[in-house]
Amino acid sequence: MRVADFHFDLPEALIARHPLPERRASRLLALDGPTGTLAHRQFADLLDYLRPGDLMVFNNTRVIPARLFGQKESGGKLEVLVERVLDQDRVLAHIRASKAPKPGTRILVEGGGSAEMLQRHDALFELAFAEPVLPLLERVGHMPLPPYIDRPDDAADRERYQTVYAQRAGAVAAPTAGLHFDEALLEAIRAKGVDTAFVTLHVGAGTFQPVRVERIEDHVMHREWLEVGQDVVDAVSVCRARGGRVVAVGTTSVRSLESAARDGELKPFSGDTDIFIYPGRPFHVVDALVTNFHLPESTLLMLVSAFAGYPETMAAYAAAVAQGYRFFSYGDAMFITRNPAPRGPED
């Protein structure tokens, strides 16, 4: 299966670089997977697609202000993007600098704080900070906006590049499907008889890395930490018993649930995942999906194609471009019901 099969042309003007004034003001493109039927709606209309007895599963990870600016003690400027917090004062990070720091190099953080480079792990650097790292990031860190937003972060991003239900700090990218939900919409969803549950997947910077191989099967996924608790397993079981659907909010929720059900049965799971879902891979848990519009040739577009079917997905994206939908993290959303017999690009 070729990566190029997942290319589509996207005008620059359709890349959303700022959020809309209200979270639920986005548009919603509904795709019925079994029929390929499309409906152009507003995100607040999501309620029309939910049924009493359904279960919505959200990712409650919290984005940390993971980008730091600073310099080596010798004077060379650098930029640090924390990838993973290892413990109270140690992290794995990407570093952009004219010359990579060597072990023992002291880094002075702009705004206050310092760290020592301990060792290198392939493309990542292990850093030890002189103080607890999460409070330091909250004090002097910058929100790690995706590269395609192409602007400095501002004060509004601290609130808007974060879901209203974010709890567990550790992500360096937002689970963006969740950005559309405000407290009032969540209350309305529960009032309709739809249950909610929360998984955690700390989204890594690898989510933005392009696929650099020609054939999908040769791609190696980045690893991310996730946790699916017994409460989620029980909620899914109750939902199934009453004939409800499991509605995943975001591809990270999909990857969490399907990682915890790799043998076909959903079980509690805590640890790293490198699950790669593309056309031909089965889904064991998720029946419907809320998701944003993804980058051309990205692994997330491949996941959506596996869920809805390749021709249906690409037709929906073509319609979204033609209708001027806003794309990517701060953009519009889709509601998709799973296609029971999805076709791939080679079918």
Curated annotation (Swiss-Prot):
Its main location: cytoplasm. One of its GO terms (cellular component) is cytoplasm. GO terms for molecular function: S-adenosylmethionine:tRNA ribosyltransferase-isomerase activity. GO terms for biological process: queuosine biosynthetic process; tRNA wobble guanine modification. Its EC number is 2.4.99.17. It is found in: Cytoplasm. Pathway: tRNA modification; tRNA-queuosine biosynthesis. InterPro entries: QueA, QueA_dom1, QueA_dom2, QueA_sf. It catalyses: 7-aminomethyl-7-carbaguanosine(34) in tRNA + S-adenosyl-L-methionine = epoxyqueuosine(34) in tRNA + adenine + L-methionine + 2 H(+). Keywords: Cytoplasm, Queuosine biosynthesis, S-adenosyl-L-methionine, Transferase. Belongs to the QueA family. Monomer. PANTHER family: S-ADENOSYLMETHIONINE:TRNA RIBOSYLTRANSFERASE-ISOMERASE. Transfers and isomerizes the ribose moiety from AdoMet to the 7-aminomethyl group of 7-deazaguanine (preQ1-tRNA) to give epoxyqueuosine (oQ-tRNA). This is S-adenosylmethionine:tRNA ribosyltransferase-isomerase. It comes from Pseudomonas aeruginosa (strain LESB58).
